[in-house]
């Protein structure tokens, strides 16, 4: 039986939705010099490299969220010619094979693909025995998420949930963390097959937005809402490799799912590795191997 670690027990007691609502309002406030002071402190505290931003001037950002979702100079993130490229800056939390329907979270903790995908077993079956990668975006990272490959948007599902932190300690301590936190599930169809990008919320993550929809989970009220789904069968929503697909307004985690025999990860990819948007992530799997 998977049990929670005592080290994360206080998170069960915190009013996480209320704290996140408050943080979102602060992050969107135009507070002049106070906003600049907050951004300056954040840059110092987390070692943010502003030289990579299109706009490195801290004083010019009207809100903290405007700073947090700042675009990068794209010449700093060249797009690999590999079949699949890394969709975000961050650290690899875990990656590997989906064992039946089970995805590895941390030692002693697995969760099911169906649970991650909002209980949709039929959708989850596409990924049984496939591959997954979990990418953690720390506070210092660039927080836009990009396309790993050319693909058409097929479905999007919003699943309300909890808002535990997604740092390493919490990942080790909270069973089924990514399948219980609030998340936005994006399903794509590429020339190689379907895949899922799951944008997982966390404590004080202001909201999640996609380029085709805008903000999916606006922080205008406390607490969870119902599951919502959008289908794009009749729409021609095609995004190219390297295009922005979404962003976090305060950071979190991306979980990627691929069917069996679809991809072969870059051999250099391993848990704990620092990664950058645009680098080689994977190639199309060789069926003969």
From Swiss-Prot:
GO terms for molecular function: phosphatidylserine decarboxylase activity. The lineage of its organism: Bacteria, Pseudomonadati, Pseudomonadota, Betaproteobacteria, Nitrosomonadales. One of its GO terms (cellular component) is plasma membrane. Heterodimer of a large membrane-associated beta subunit and a small pyruvoyl-containing alpha subunit. This is Phosphatidylserine decarboxylase proenzyme. It is found in: Cell membrane. Signal peptide: none annotated. It comes from Nitrosospira multiformis (strain ATCC 25196 / NCIMB 11849 / C 71). The modification Pyruvic acid (Ser) is found at residue 252. HAMAP family: PS_decarb_PSD_B_type1. Its EC number is 4.1.1.65. It is a peripheral membrane protein. Pfam families: PS_Dcarbxylase. It is an enzyme of class 4 (lyase). Its cofactor is pyruvate. The gene is psd. The active site is at residues 89, 146, 252.
């Amino acid at each position: 039986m998977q049990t929670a670690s005592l080290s994360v027990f206080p998170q069960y007691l915190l009013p996480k939705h209320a704290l996140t609502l408050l943080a979102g309002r602060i992050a969107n406030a135009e507070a002049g010099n106070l906003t600049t002071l907050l951004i300056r402190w954040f840059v110092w505290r987390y070692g943010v490299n502003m030289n990579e931003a299109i706009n490195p001037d801290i004083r010019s950002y009207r809100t903290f969220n405007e700073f947090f979702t700042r675009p990068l100079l794209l010449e700093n993130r060249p797009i690999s010619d590999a079949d699949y490229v890394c969709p975000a800056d961050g650290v690899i939390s875990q990656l590997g094979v989906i064992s039946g329907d089970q995805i590895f979270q941390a030692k002693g903790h697995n969760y099911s693909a169906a649970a991650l995908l909002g209980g949709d077993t039929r959708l989850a079956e596409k990924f049984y025995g496939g591959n997954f990668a979990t990418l953690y975006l720390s506070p210092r990272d660039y927080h836009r998420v990009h396309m790993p490959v050319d693909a058409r948007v097929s479905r999007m599902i919003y699943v309300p949930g909890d808002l535990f932190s997604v740092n390493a300690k919490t990942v080790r301590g909270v069973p089924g963390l990514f399948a219980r936190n609030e998340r936005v599930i994006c399903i794509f169809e590429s020339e190689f097959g379907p895949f899922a990008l799951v944008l997982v919320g966390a404590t004080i993550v202001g909201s999640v937005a996609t380029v085709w929809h805008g903000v999916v989970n606006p922080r205008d009220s406390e607490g969870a809402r119902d599951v919502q789904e959008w289908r794009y069968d009749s729409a021609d929503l095609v995004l190219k490799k390297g295009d922005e697909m979404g962003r976090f307004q305060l950071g979190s985690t991306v979980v990627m799912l691929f069917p069996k025999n679809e991809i072969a990860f870059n051999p250099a990819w391993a848990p704990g590795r620092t990664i950058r948007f645009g680098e080689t992530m994977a190639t199309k799997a060789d069926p003969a191997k």
